[in-house]
């Protein structure tokens, strides 16, 4: 008999709902699963085995994820890893000054040496007319 292919269950640090074409991501935090709108994520910050999601409304969600898993799960046209500890939503960048990406007037993330070339390529490609 034909049966649908079985999916392996998600491993620790993975999420069940991370297809790149989705609008929301499911996140386990504080003993519950929450749906977070992907466009509301300003940046992600690695804290050891945890990832802190900084959201547009100023709140944060800390979840047991690896930043590497989030990097592959989020849409690459909207998110870029810019440091070993940070992934930013490219649509939320307000300024780029001396190796720092400003997300608002006071909050910024550093750009790691290994990520500068790729980020500069993104800037050159998308903002060359400025």
PLM ranges: what are they?
Residues 1-104, 108-110:
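Conserved binding/recognition cores within well-folded domains
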Residues 119:
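Basic, Lys/Arg-enriched C-terminal extension of HTH/homeodomain DNA-binding domains
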């Amino acid at each position: 008999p034909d049966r649908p292919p079985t999916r392996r269950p998600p491993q620790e640090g993975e999420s069940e709902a991370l297809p790149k074409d989705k609008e929301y991501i499911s996140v386990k935090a504080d003993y519950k699963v929450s749906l977070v709108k992907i466009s509301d994520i300003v940046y992600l910050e690695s804290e050891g085995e945890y990832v802190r999601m900084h959201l547009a409304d100023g709140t944060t969600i800390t979840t047991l994820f690896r930043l590497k898993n989030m990097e592959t799960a989020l849409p690459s046209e909207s998110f870029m890893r810019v440091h070993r500890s940070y992934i930013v939503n490219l649509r939320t960048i307000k300024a780029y000054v001396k190796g720092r990406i400003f997300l608002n007037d006071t909050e910024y993330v550093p750009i790691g040496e290994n990520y500068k070339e790729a980020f500069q390529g993104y800037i050159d490609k998308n903002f060359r007319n400025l």
